[in-house]
Amino acid sequence: MMSLIRVNQLTFSHPGQLMPLFENVSLDLDTDWRLGFVGRNGRGKTTFFKILMGAYEAQGSVTANVAFDYFPYEVAHPDWLTIDVLNEITPMAEEWQLRRELSLLGVNDDVLWRPFETLSQGEQTKVLLAMLFLNEGRFLLIDEPTNHLDGQGRRLVADYLRRKKGFILVSHDRTFLDGCVDHIMALNKTSIDVHQGDFSTWWENFERRQAFEEAQNERLQREVKSLTQAARRTGAWSDKVEASKFGQGPVDRGFIGHKAEKMMKRSKAIEKRRERAVEEAKSLLQDVEKSEALKLTPLPHWSEVLVRVENVAICHGDNVRLPPISLTLSRGERVVLDGANGCGKSSLLHAIMGEHSDYTGTIRLASGLVISTVPQGTSHLKGSLRDYIEAQHIDTTLCMTMLRKLDFDRALFEQPMETYSTGQKKKVLLAKSLSESAHLYIWDEPFNYIDLYSRLQLEEMIQTYQPTMLLVEHDQAFRENIATRTVNL
């Protein structure tokens, strides 16, 4: 049954934060809605979830007659069988109910009899979603479920969520959001607002509203400039006329004084119009998302073919992990490797980069090939950002400029990287690669945890500079916009 989650005058700041993360936010959310929650990295989506869960105290109030559950759920005993994890999380659910949910998600129910920790990350995501939806009367707060899902997994989870109701979903995947939400909750610079419809509808309206505000701002700036000049001219004329009455007769002085007074009134009226225009301009652009263009300096290479893979099969011990594959990567191509989780996409990238030697077949790289990489994981990022950048032998100023363009807060430059969110760490890896001149850019799931606006910046950059790339990425919209070819493993 429908009810409301009411957020009233919510204000919150992290300790030591100068500006509040949220200020006087008020929202009414229907518990039957399927809400997509979008916004820049670091703007407070996860923090908002924690406030709803009661983990953080904030000024204002949150009232709801439903309990909240959070995904990803922290499993206390990952070594237990999955069926036992189910019984702990959802003690009232029956095994047949979980089997039904798993079938909708394309998961074989034999996972129930395996230790939870042995499941792939994609399987764990699906199992936890199924378990949490079996908790009746709960409203789910789902935080970036797609990061460990391949393309097929994302489609299955989107179809699954479309059958459900009562959740807020954080995701930056445009196609995924379009497939499963009926409202968008946008976390802007100064506000949170809610719109009915899917992601594409919201985005179209958002861009239209931004363009309107920018046009209005330009008009008002021209008006302010014109009125400022007019006020100065009128004021100067008034002073000049007032000064000219000295040495005149009484009648002339009265006439001239009256004329000066009229001109002064006109000057004040112009000044009031200017002040109104300035105030109107201040109300605009508060939530406009400005993104500076990113730059890249790919190196030219004399060879037409940069990478040649011939009958390569990645091995793990004595086991071959995927059938032999052959491919060539030519100069100017942007090839996306596709396939189910665990089929060996990342392992093939590592083999091409010389970081995985356990394979059969042949990999040939063009002579003198310079490769820049974005790895999938971020756990190696620790300590000082400046020390990390210097260790990569890249220009510190250039790398930090790239980070600022990706909406990376200056205050983070002086904080240890262990304190960064996963999205912020991913931006460090991307900025490092963008600061490198290379013949070939190899990026392994670069968009995991990266916000929509940064994704669009990266798309535009790739379309502008046309680098040679080999990628693993499951964001369907990005692939359609930049890939010249897809290779299925």
Q: Which residue stretches match the model-derived regions?
A:
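ABC ATP-binding cassette signature C-motif
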Residues: 1-215, 301-489
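Extended, highly charged alpha-helical segments
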Residues: 77-80, 84-101, 179, 186-291
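Intrinsically disordered, low-complexity boundary segments flanking structured domains
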Residues: 57, 135, 278-281, 296
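Coiled-coil termination/hinge junctions
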Residues: 282-307
